[in-house]
Swiss-Prot record:
Lineage: Bacteria, Pseudomonadati, Pseudomonadota, Gammaproteobacteria, Lysobacterales
Start and end residues of each S1-like domain: 1-72
SMART domains associated with the record: S1
Gene Ontology terms for molecular function: ribosome binding; rRNA binding; translation initiation factor activity
One Pfam family this sequence matches: eIF-1a
Subcellular location(s) of the protein: Cytoplasm
Major place of residence: cytoplasm
Function summary: One of the essential components for the initiation of protein synthesis. Stabilizes the binding of IF-2 and IF-3 on the 30S subunit to which N-formylmethionyl-tRNA(fMet) subsequently binds. Helps modulate mRNA selection, yielding the 30S pre-initiation complex (PIC). Upon addition of the 50S ribosomal subunit IF-1, IF-2 and IF-3 are released leaving the mature 70S translation initiation complex.
CDD domains reported for this sequence: S1_IF1
Entry protein name: Translation initiation factor IF-1
GO cellular component: cytosol
Keywords: Cytoplasm, Initiation factor, Protein biosynthesis, RNA-binding, rRNA-binding
Length: 72
């Protein structure tokens, strides 16, 4: 369930960091830090370096995000 004020971007995982955190390079060229959403953790969705992902961000902090979907 996403909020109406959240912003969605697509990007690719460029680096894996500790504690299910990833460095994601967005389509517009920016790099952010993103963590896995709870639903993806619950369903044991694995994310590896190079995967295409959909990231949800708030307009308040554009340096952090939440990975909500891994592209097939």
């Amino acid at each position: 369930m996403s909020n109406d004020d959240s912003i969605e971007f697509e990007g690719s995982v460029s680096e894996t960091l500790p504690n299910t955190t990833f460095r994601v390079k967005l389509e517009n060229g920016y790099e952010i830090i993103a963590h896995i959403s709870g639903r993806m953790r619950k369903n044991y969705i694995r994310i590896l370096t190079g995967d295409r992902v959909k990231v949800e961000m708030t307009p308040y902090d554009l340096t952090k995000g939440r990975i909500t979907y891994r592209m097939k």
